[in-house]
Amino acid sequence: MKLFVGLGNPGAKYAGNRHNIGFMALDQIASDHGFSPWKSKFQAQMSEGTLSGEKVILLKPQTFMNNSGQSVGEALRFFKLTPADVVVFHDELDLAPSKCRVKNGGGHAGHNGLRSIHAHIGADYGRVRLGVGHPGHKDAVAGYVLRDFPKADQGWLDDLMRGLSDGAAALATGDSGRFMNAVALRVAPPRSSTGEASKGRKKAQKSEPGVAKTPAKAATPEAPAAGDIPAAPEDSRSPMQKLLDKFK
């Protein structure tokens, strides 16, 4: 059994915040993989399902971020799990938006949700770090993570959520490499080799050294047909006038 924990703050006010990206990830997994309806348990919203034959509990603590460990500790003890069975999805300031990294154990890096989990179950649990970027100064962090993702971020955010869901089964079986591949295929899909080769060929044709372009020949105007040559105007002078004109 695995316990997937998504970090965030409860309530509609916070639903679209950067700090709630962990909740968003679990919502996507639950929706895509037919998990049970969410119910209240362990001071959290909980859903159950199966991924690649592995039973998985999804947990969204409703204690607010700074007390997330209370909920995680309760669930861990109830299901008789170890910290190694836990994977926490959380926002990561030190990763650029759309980036994702898997980590096992280590410090909390000042993240209050992780700090609380450390206090209740120790540090030996897995994390899926979801990049949201950094505002540039530590004094701006609180306001930054408690603001909604802007509309401009919705494209990569949707791709990231789908990638996390695609790879969830691999994560449940401990295959972090396959999980990361699934995420990468959504966030940075491979380009068409045919399209790239075609572009390359066109570029080469445009700039191939040593090949002089032959200028196009100017079109030679066609000679008019015999019937098209205008006839000389008729001479209307009298014979006497013609004779006089010769001596002018």
Curated annotation (Swiss-Prot):
It is found in: Cytoplasm. One of its GO terms (cellular component) is cytoplasm. Its main location: cytoplasm. Residues 190-248 are annotated as: Disordered. Keywords: Cytoplasm, Hydrolase, RNA-binding, tRNA-binding. TRNA binds at Y14, F64, N66, N112. The record marks D91 as: Stabilizes the basic form of H active site to accept a proton. It catalyses: an N-acyl-L-alpha-aminoacyl-tRNA + H2O = an N-acyl-L-amino acid + a tRNA + H(+). Residues 212-226 have a biased composition (Low complexity). SUPFAM superfamilies: Peptidyl-tRNA hydrolase-like. Its EC number is 3.1.1.29. Belongs to the PTH family. Monomer. PANTHER family: PEPTIDYL-TRNA HYDROLASE. This is Peptidyl-tRNA hydrolase. The lineage of its organism: Bacteria, Pseudomonadati, Pseudomonadota, Alphaproteobacteria, Rhodobacterales.
